[in-house]
From Swiss-Prot:
Top-rank taxon: Eukaryota
Function summary: Sequence-specific transcription factor which is part of a developmental regulatory system that provides cells with specific positional identities on the anterior-posterior axis.
Subcellular locations according to the entry: Nucleus
Organism this protein belongs to: Notophthalmus viridescens (Eastern newt)
Official protein name in the record: Homeobox protein Hox-A2
Amino acid sequence: GSRRLRTAYTNTQLLELEKEFHFNKYLCRPRRVEIAALLDLTERQVKVWFQNRRMKHKRQTQCKENQNGEGKGKGLEEGDRSEDEEEKAL
């Protein structure tokens, strides 16, 4: 298809985007326009970066919750159960 090339962000751009994300998970359009102009990116690049960053943030926070013991054992129990069932079948 006619997919865009992957954007390679500079360290400066990433630093600014991360800094902005730290204060605001969501951008209003005027702020997006401002950041895009500031970092010499398109609005779309800024928008997509924020979308992707929110998903990454969501994944990371879900991982942390699992490490706290919530939902961690469930996966293991399910795994063990299926192995036990396989052994019984033999």
